[in-house]
């Protein structure tokens, strides 16, 4: 049974952007997939809607709500859901960070078990809108039967979604016409413009550990697309000029950009972790340090970790490596840094083995570049601070992001062997120095700085949010419904 924790109060409502007199207050429910790369943008979007004076109910599971306590705005109503027990999941596993990628299929199975609880919430509270994620394939039809307007908030980049399939039916039936490796490693025929956005052969090989039996991600996403009144993207028109109209054409549904939702730098300067890292960074020359982070969930092999480490050593550059011991391709794999690496690079390298405050690190004046896996959130955070990117994509959307960003000349992708994806220390070192040290890196630095100005334009961001909320107000349930009637 769900447990609604009300943080909202009349005083808080009065301090938010007041609703124009002739508009009704909406009730918007939001329900993300159980991955923090999804949960945090959903929570941020929820806060922005609430700040416009609307009631927002944020749905997630009990343990995740507890983890989010410092992020939750008092304007938001929190709805705690009890995740059904699935035998194959570890005890208390309620997010993708809690499980090996092989077991994410069971987390999706558990989320599917939330259907009765979420349905009861919708029946009893009758929100005007429900904003959901790609996994919740069963939710659009339930919401439609209750007269609730439906939006899919996609935290994946629009070019990735456009690449995956030409229509929701193609997603559902796994029938986009691509049957060969060559088909999948060239831009699809439904792209009406030239682009480098496509997978390579070694990208396809890396997908295998993520494939699982049961309801496919394609089916889930296709059903979500098919049942939605609109699609929401964490994007600017300026960065998705071609892609957003293409998605509208492919899926025949309105596509609404909500802005980039850039995160805020935490205000606690006395955080012990940050104090230690800052002290190290303060001792380095301005614009000299490369920040390295590959996310907390990607599968990275022992060979890749060794070559990346030796490449950092070979480059001669100062670095901070947020090294949360990666998960190997199999559960039994043990991934370790090469012997002696930490000691040999101690004078110019900091290997941080627990959680690292990424935004704070990227904001420090000594940082000059970002070696990243190209997750969509990390891209925004790196470019917010004008850092050129050294890109080492791992799987799924990350290679597609890297191809587009390399084409826009905000960084370069570290070369791999085209057949097997093998990485070498020489390619790592050469890529780092090309972006950070050599003259050829000046174009990447200049373009990253230019994007930083766009990403930090608060006026533009506020306009996107206002237009998005205005869309919700004008299109709720197709006709205005007074909550008091």
Curated annotation (Swiss-Prot):
The keyword Glycosyltransferase applies. It comes from the Eukaryota. InterPro entries: UDP-glycosyltransf_plant (IPR050481), UDP_glucos_trans (IPR002213), UDP_glycos_trans_CS (IPR035595). Keywords: Glycosyltransferase, Transferase. UDP-alpha-D-glucose binds at residues 296, 355-356, 373-381, 395-398. Transmembrane segments: none annotated. Its EC number is 2.4.1.-. It holds the Pfam family UDPGT. Disulfide bonds: none annotated. GO terms for molecular function: UDP-glucosyltransferase activity. Belongs to the UDP-glycosyltransferase family. May glycosylate diterpenes or flavonols in leaves. This is UDP-glycosyltransferase 91D1. The gene is UGT91D1.
């Amino acid at each position: 049974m769900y447990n609604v924790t009300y943080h909202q109060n009349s005083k808080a409502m009065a301090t938010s952007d007041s609703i124009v007199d002739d508009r009704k207050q909406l009730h918007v429910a939001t329900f993300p997939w159980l991955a923090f790369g999804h949960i945090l943008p959903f929570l941020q979007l929820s806060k922005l809607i609430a700040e416009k004076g609307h009631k927002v109910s944020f749905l997630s599971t009990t343990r995740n709500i507890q983890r989010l306590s410092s992020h939750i705005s008092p304007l938001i109503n929190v709805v705690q859901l009890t995740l059904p027990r699935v035998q194959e999941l570890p005890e208390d596993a309620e997010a993708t960070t809690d499980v090996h990628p092989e077991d994410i299929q069971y987390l999706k199975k558990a989320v599917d078990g939330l259907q009765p609880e979420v349905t009861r919430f919708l029946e009893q509270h009758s929100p005007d809108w429900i904003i959901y994620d790609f996994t919740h394939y069963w939710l659009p039809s339930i919401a439609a039967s209750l007269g609730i307007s439906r939006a899919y908030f996609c935290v994946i980049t629009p070019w990735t979604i456009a690449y995956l399939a030409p229509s929701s039916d193609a997603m559902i039936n796994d029938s986009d016409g691509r049957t060969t490796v060559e088909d999948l490693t060239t831009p699809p025929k439904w792209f009406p413009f030239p682009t480098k956005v496509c997978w390579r052969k070694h990208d396809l090989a890396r997908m295998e550990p993520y494939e699982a039996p049961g309801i496919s991600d394609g089916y889930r996403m296709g059903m979500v697309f098919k049942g939605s009144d609109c699609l929401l993207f964490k994007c600017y028109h300026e960065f998705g000029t071609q892609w957003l109209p293409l998605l509208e054409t492919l899926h025949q549904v309105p596509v609404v950009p909500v802005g980039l939702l850039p995160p805020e730098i935490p205000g606690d300067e006395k955080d012990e972790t940050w104090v230690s890292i800052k002290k190290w960074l303060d001792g380095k020359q301005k614009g000299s340090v490369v920040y390295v982070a590959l996310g907390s969930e990607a599968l990275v092999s022992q060979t890749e970790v060794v070559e990346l480490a030796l490449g950092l050593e070979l480059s001669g550059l100062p670095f901070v490596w947020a090294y949360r011991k990666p998960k190997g391709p199999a559960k039994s794999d043990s991934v370790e840094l090469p012997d002696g690496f930490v000691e040999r690079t101690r004078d110019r390298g900091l290997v941080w083995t627990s959680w690292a405050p990424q935004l704070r690190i990227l904001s420090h004046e000594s940082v000059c570049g970002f070696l990243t896996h190209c997750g969509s959130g990390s891209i925004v955070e790196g470019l917010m601070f004008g850092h050129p990117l050294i890109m080492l994509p791992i799987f799924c959307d990350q290679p597609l992001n890297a191809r587009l960003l390399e084409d826009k000349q905000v960084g370069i992708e570290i070369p791999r062997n085209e057949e097997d994806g093998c990485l070498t220390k020489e390619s790592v070192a050469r890529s780092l120095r090309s972006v950070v040290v050599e003259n050829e890196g000046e174009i990447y630095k200049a373009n990253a700085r230019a994007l930083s100005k766009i990403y930090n334009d608060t006026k533009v961001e506020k306009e996107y949010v206002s237009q998005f909320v205005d869309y919700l107000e004008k299109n709720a349930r197709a006709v205005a419904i007074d909550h008091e009637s």
